[in-house]
Amino acid sequence: MNKGSVGLMAMIFACSVALTAQDTVRYSGQVRSNVDYHHGQLVAAVGAHNIQTMRALRTGSDVPSWTYNHAPMMAYWKGRYWVSYLSNPVGEHVPPGRTLLQSSVDGYVWSSPVVAFPPYRIPDGHVKTGRSDTARNAYAVMHQRIGFHTSASGRLFVLGFYGIVLGAKDDPNDGNGIGRVIREVKPDGGMGEIYFLRYNKGFGAHNTSYPFYHHSKDKDFITACESFLSDPLQMMQTVEEADRDDPLIPLRRDYKAFSHYRLDDGRVVGLWKHALTSMSADGGKTWQYLPLRAPGFVNANAKIWGQRTSDGKFATVYNPAEFRWPLALSVSTNGLVYTNLLLVNGEITSMRYGGAYKSYGPQYVRGIQPGDGVPADGNMWVTYSMNKEDIWVSRIPVPIHDRVDAHVDDRFASSNASILFNQWNIFSPLWCRVGIDRIGDSTALVLRDADPFDHAKADRIFPSSGRVRMELSLTADQTDHGSLEIELTDVHGMPTLRLILDSTGKILTKQGYRNKSVGSYVKGRSINIDLTLDAASRFYTLSIDGGKSSNNLCFQPVAEVSRLVLRTGTVRRFPDADTPTDQDYDLPGAENKYKEVRYLIHSLRTSVPK
């Protein structure tokens, strides 16, 4: 989260130029993200589910009331997903700071956050090395690149770091903080006593509030702490906050946000911000070359995550731009050569609360590091913040696919509704949930929306087609508020047609600048849409509830269509590449829900027209 320097960027550039035949991670694909679109015009990873775990609120006394929430970490332990994240009241590096913890059995329904590490008082009179500011009634700011450690005996620990910020342009990760703390997580979500794991210079048992881990009577806990401290791959993730001459850290350089995975031959691949990379043949003790920018990768001052997936391949997840959108992934068969670039999350929620250094977009991605659990479903799970404000996770099905071979025949009243749901791509905020619900004696894919600043979204990918028939059956639970937009898009997310269930009971279609009425709908009564599109002619025929077909012109030409989009709101185009960063204002009404809307999707069928 340190803003970096011109010197570092110059070093990265020089190293990149020098990199020629080095055996290293590289991106060989030709696809690039287009920053003018939140989704980057990227092909979607089929079945990616994006789920909000925490929505920040300014009012109230509960833990989500702090509106800077960032840098989440993830683990899987005892059949639960665990996420920790750091939090400040308003902005980045503005004290006080704390770390919070959430958990979930299924990755979709999450516990309320609880404080793992509370605000910590800096000793009065403390003067930070290199600065003249003196601490008076001051509190620490938390900053950590590693959030969990699972011991050899199977115990889970949450970690954090108390850094010091005493004035403008000060940073908590400059090596002049207080120290790293550790705490056991219990299977029921409770936590043990807080201990210091490692002090920074000038701090020790004489001037800190928590005991040093050596003082614990739990020998297995002490063993777990010492195992962490002796593991170079764990310690590499502490370099930013640690003493600059800490002998336990193998590579004491200003590289940020380390992640790693092992190749089939046992070598460790390291990844850092700016898509820097290096290799280690001895488990991280030494590195074969100073980190260099991975050829072909595009990544700025945001994290890049890499891991082995359950099918034996490898994946990196990152923002492939100089901005923090979209969130995308690349896949490799050998862990070195990455060949594609697929969309994970192409939405940007409205930033409801201003604050220092708050960047737009889904960012600071982190997965489950080796040793911290393997999800039972075999899928890839990552966590990240949205706008440094809300906390999200994504479930990415493994094997990772960018297309489907068979046309869709999804009937959600059937017994395999959950299997069908896994083939949809969803964007599911806490106040706009997307999921399979039981409605009466049947089940449906349900989109809800009670958030004035967000929307629910569900996409279904089908085989790329120049001509396609789509049969969609759904029910709206209201006609006097809310709206649902239905689009057919090409593989890059570009819509060619849009139907709208508006807030007055009308069904509209977008015709250039204007919307044209094509029918009406009734609360609680199913709507059956039968649509046949010819992309070459740009016309589509539309029949509603078996009525007479109407001929309609697409509002944007595309060569093919391969995605149905259902969205409880309009397309978002803010922010863009020219939007100033560091938003310093709040959006009015961000605390309030509006009257919920609900849309029930009963079935979807696509086919080649006769």
Segments predicted by a language model, with ranges:
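Extracellular/lumenal carbohydrate-interaction signature centered on repeated Trp-anchored short motifs
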Residues: P64, D459-M470, V518-R525, K595-L600
